[in-house]
Amino acid sequence: MKASYFLASKYAQALLGTLEEKGEISRLDEYVEAFQRLKKALESSESLRDMVYSPLIPPKHIVSRMKDVSEFDDTIFVQFLEVLADKRRQNLIPFMSHILYQESLEREKVVEVRLVLPNEVSNTIINQVKQAIQNKTGRKIKLRTQFNEDLIGGLQLYIGDKFFDYSVKGFLQDIQSAYAPIGGGEIFES
């Protein structure tokens, strides 16, 4: 069966509901980390992926292997893996990992921000950008910085699923698209 983000969200909501019902929602980060370890292992190991997704291997063996890989021996987690394996829904794990991670950020009122700069800058400047975003959003910021020399100057921000381009490269591309020849082609051809 093909993996579906919609179906994965239903399973993730069921897990969240169970955690809330059992009073274990405060341990959500542990579950997120376990799913992320499992996802990473499935992406990096073809033999593990073949074994976990195989319809021929008994679900109990699949659950045992997933539990070992996730390094998380929790009753609710193992029971949830058993449900996934019994229904042959192991292929939803990568989507569920992402959904649970986003839910964890939302519950902690944290926004994940990726800051792309043309070159290295001081921590003071990075902290100023972080503080400005935190003031605008009213949330804690989980900031990751990257460097891309192609930007020439300025910066690019990825805040959640939104993209803000304040780079020289982006400005030049805007100019080019605004003044591009009607027949297409590059305005700055050599």
Curated annotation (Swiss-Prot):
It is a peripheral membrane protein. One of its GO terms (molecular function) is proton-transporting ATP synthase activity, rotational mechanism. The keyword Membrane applies. The keyword Transport applies. Its main location: membrane. It is found in: Cell inner membrane. InterPro entries: ATP_synth_OSCP/delta_N_sf, ATPase_OSCP/dsu. It comes from the Bacteria. One of its GO terms (cellular component) is plasma membrane. SUPFAM superfamilies: N-terminal domain of the delta subunit of the F1F0-ATP synthase. F-type ATPases have 2 components, F(1) - the catalytic core - and F(0) - the membrane proton channel. F(1) has five subunits: alpha(3), beta(3), gamma(1), delta(1), epsilon(1). F(0) has three main subunits: a(1), b(2) and c(10-14). The alpha and beta chains form an alternating ring which encloses part of the gamma chain. F(1) is attached to F(0) by a central stalk formed by the gamma and epsilon chains, while a peripheral stalk is formed by the delta and b chains. F(1)F(0) ATP synthase produces ATP from ADP in the presence of a proton or sodium gradient. F-type ATPases consist of two structural domains, F(1) containing the extramembraneous catalytic core and F(0) containing the membrane proton channel, linked together by a central stalk and a peripheral stalk. During catalysis, ATP synthesis in the catalytic domain of F(1) is coupled via a rotary mechanism of the central stalk subunits to proton translocation. This protein is part of the stalk that links CF(0) to CF(1). It either transmits conformational changes from CF(0) to CF(1) or is implicated in proton conduction. Belongs to the ATPase delta chain family. PANTHER family: ATP SYNTHASE DELTA CHAIN. This is ATP synthase subunit delta. It comes from Petrotoga mobilis (strain DSM 10674 / SJ95). The lineage of its organism: Bacteria, Thermotogati, Thermotogota, Thermotogae, Petrotogales.
